[in-house]
C-alpha cells in the first residue's frame, strides 16, 4: 500500500550566506485523489534544531502567535505544498539534528536530518 503523504526535508545554505540555514519541508499528496490536511490551530508546521546531546537550541515557532481556530489545507492529487523557514546559525559549531514537523491531525509527520557546522 502506498503512503498517501510523502515528505522530503532539506537543509541548504543560501549562496554567499555563511550564517543562515534554509529549511524546506515538501509535503506531497501521493494519491490521485484530493486530500485535506487538518490542523488543530493556525500553526501548520515547525522546525527544531537540537545539539549533539539532544538539547533544543532553536524552535521556529517559539515566541510566535498562531490563531486558535482549526484550519485545513487541501492538496489535489499528486500536488505538493512547501513549508520554508530560515535559522541563523551564527556562533554554532558541531553536530546537530534538525526536525521538521507537519502538525496535521490526520497526516502528522516528523522527520529528521543530521548536519554538521564547522
Task: Describe each model-derived feature in a short phrase.
Residues 88-118:
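Terminal connector regions
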Residues 3-7, 16, 21-83, 97-104:
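Contiguous segments within soluble domain cores/interaction surfaces
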Residues 11-13:
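Extracytoplasmic/periplasm-facing segments of secreted or lipoprotein envelope proteins
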Amino acid at each position: 500500500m502506498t503512503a498517501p503523504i510523502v515528505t522530503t526535508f532539506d537543509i541548504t545554505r543560501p549562496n554567499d550566506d555563511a550564517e543562515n540555514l534554509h529549511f524546506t519541508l515538501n509535503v506531497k499528496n501521493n494519491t490521485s485523489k484530493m486530500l485535506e490536511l487538518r490542523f488543530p490551530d493556525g500553526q501548520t508546521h515547525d522546525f527544531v534544531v537540537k545539539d549533539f546531546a539532544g538539547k533544543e537550541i532553536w524552535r521556529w515557532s517559539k515566541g510566535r502567535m498562531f490563531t486558535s481556530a482549526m484550519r485545513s489545507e487541501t492538496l489535489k492529487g499528486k500536488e505538493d505544498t512547501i513549508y520554508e523557514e530560515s535559522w541563523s546559525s551564527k556562533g554554532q559549531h558541531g553536530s546537530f539534528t534538525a526536525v521538521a514537523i507537519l502538525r496535521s491531525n490526520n497526516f502528522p509527520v516528523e522527520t529528521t536530518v543530521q548536519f554538521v557546522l564547522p
